[in-house]
């Protein structure tokens, strides 16, 4: 059920429908499930009026899309960005539903946020906005109903303000938000989880498809886009393992280091981003070996790339950029961002995979970046038990979840993708579609739960 002004949601739905076609041909009863599952259970939209530092009232739109609760409470982030609209949040909530299913934890899918822009705002303005936002949202969320989290524009500071507002409004201390501070109900590894989880997933892909590009080798070249939380911890984990990080980027351009980023450089960038700065402002501080390219993403700037990890935002890899990555010898593309590749880019990668064992193997964000929400689920579990697990315990559980997620996607893609092996590729040598596998495994799990609960028949 797509409206004409919902391009992002239409793209996500079309991707799922395309992946499901071979399965639906042999299991036509699930067509009704697809028809029902694409409609969110509830969409909330509300006015947020807040006071700026000049004492003047400002207004923004607030949203919460409670997409599907067949597997557990609605779970998904709150995005604060001027581009936020209902189409983007429906697409994110839709994807979140299947992503959460792939973690194996008891979580439904949802997404929310506002067109409020935290950039350029004072701490007091952000606090007043968060209090105003929560004064409406609090009626609709709770630890057993809907558990929001952070997202673009919503970091530790915003989560703290939102949690405090809820606690005062409800006069209760519960785990109704994840991404909390470690001293008041948060979990170790949560800030790092999406980036670390992405690398844990990619390690399984490398081991199966191209062990010569193991991440413990300095000769393995890794391109990363974005420079926020996900990209920073992705880069730090790659550097820790021993491979070479070539790039980071932001909305204004890309910062390339052909000799590789250092841990110290990533830490400086993290400090810069915490203050809302742009990458171009830090080039001189990083010293020789770093080149800034204004207005460009990294994908066309690198002559050789082995692993490409989009980590910025949706549709950040175009058809032209995908072709450049294939030409650069890329073997693995795994999304740290949600729907980071356009449909045209995905088609390039999938055609490359089908044509050759040495082609590009693509992993969609709903699988490869599910580490963040997985640790959010672990935070919910810790809150329910009123205890805290150690860093080592949480990291071990995250590795286990990502390994299981990879195996589920691999198995489902092998079984249900309906693909014919390309000429010249041996039957057992072909790489399965992880895109089809993720979509199929997530969809079937949610659809079966919905049927057992009477949501379709």
UniProtKB/Swiss-Prot annotation:
Stored InterPro entries: Aminoacid_DH-like_N_sf, Glu/Leu/Phe/Val/Trp_DH, Glu/Leu/Phe/Val/Trp_DH_C, Glu/Leu/Phe/Val/Trp_DH_dimer, Glu/Leu/Phe/Val_DH_AS, Glu_DH, Glu_Leu_Phe_Val_DH, NAD(P)-bd_dom_sf
Reactions the enzyme catalyzes: L-glutamate + NADP(+) + H2O = 2-oxoglutarate + NH4(+) + NADPH + H(+)
GO terms assigned for molecular function: glutamate dehydrogenase (NADP+) activity
GO cellular component, one term: cytosol
Domain of life according to the entry: Eukaryota
EC numbers for this chain: 1.4.1.4
Subunit and interaction comment: Homohexamer.
Family in the record: Belongs to the Glu/Leu/Phe/Val dehydrogenases family.
Protein name: NADP-specific glutamate dehydrogenase
Native source organism of the sequence: Agaricus bisporus
């Amino acid at each position: 059920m797509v409206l004409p002004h919902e391009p992002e949601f239409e793209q996500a739905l079309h991707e799922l429908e395309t992946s499901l076609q071979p399965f639906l041909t042999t299991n036509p009863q699930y067509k009704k499930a697809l028809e029902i599952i694409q409609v969110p259970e509830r969409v909330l939209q509300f006015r947020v009026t807040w006071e700026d530092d000049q004492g003047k009232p400002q207004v923004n739109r607030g949203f919460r899309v409670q997409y599907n609760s067949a597997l557990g409470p609605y779970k998904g982030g709150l995005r604060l960005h001027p581009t936020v609209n209902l189409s983007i949040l429906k697409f994110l909530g839709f994807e979140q539903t299947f992503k959460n299913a792939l973690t194996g934890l008891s979580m439904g899918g949802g997404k929310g946020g506002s067109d409020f822009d935290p950039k350029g705002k004072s701490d007091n303005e952000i606090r007043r906005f968060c209090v105003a936002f929560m004064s409406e949202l609090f009626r609709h969320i709770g630890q057993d109903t809907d558990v929001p989290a952070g997202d673009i524009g919503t970091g530790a500071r915003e989560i703290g303000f939102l949690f405090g507002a809820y606690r005062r409004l409800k006069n209760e201390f519960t785990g109704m938000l994840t991404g909390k501070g470690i001293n008041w109900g948060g979990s170790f590894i949560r800030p790092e989880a999406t980036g670390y989880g992405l690398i844990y997933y990619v390690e399984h892909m490398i081991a199966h498809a191209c062990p010569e590009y193991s991440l413990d080798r300095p000769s393995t070249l890794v391109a990363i886009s974005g420079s926020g939380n996900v990209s920073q911890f992705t880069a730090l984990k790659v550097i820790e393992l021993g491979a070479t990080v070539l790039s980071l980027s932001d909305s204004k351009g890309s910062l390339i280091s052909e000799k590789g980023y250092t841990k110290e450089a990533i830490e400086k960038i993290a400090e810069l981003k915490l203050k809302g700065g742009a990458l171009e402002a830090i080039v001189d501080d990083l010293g020789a070996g770093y080149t800034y390219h204004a207005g460009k993403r990294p994908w066309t700037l690198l002559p050789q790339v082995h692993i490409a990890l989009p980590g910025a935002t949706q549709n950040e890899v175009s058809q032209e950029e995908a072709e450049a990555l294939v030409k650069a010898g890329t073997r693995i593309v795994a999304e740290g961002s949600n729907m980071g590749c356009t449909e045209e880019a995905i088609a390039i990668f999938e055609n490359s995979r089908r044509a050759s064992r040495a082609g590009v193997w693509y992993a969609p964000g709903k699988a490869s970046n599910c580490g963040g929400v997985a640790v959010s689920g672990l935070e919910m579990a810790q809150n329910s038990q009123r205890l805290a697990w150690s860093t080592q315990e949480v990291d071990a559980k995250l590795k286990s979840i990502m390994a299981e997620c990879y195996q589920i996607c691999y198995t489902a893609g092998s079984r249900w993708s309906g693909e014919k092996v390309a000429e010249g590729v041996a039957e057992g040598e072909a790489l399965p579609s992880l895109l089809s596998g993720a979509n199929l495994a997530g969809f079937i799990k949610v659809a079966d739960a919905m049927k057992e609960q009477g949501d379709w028949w």
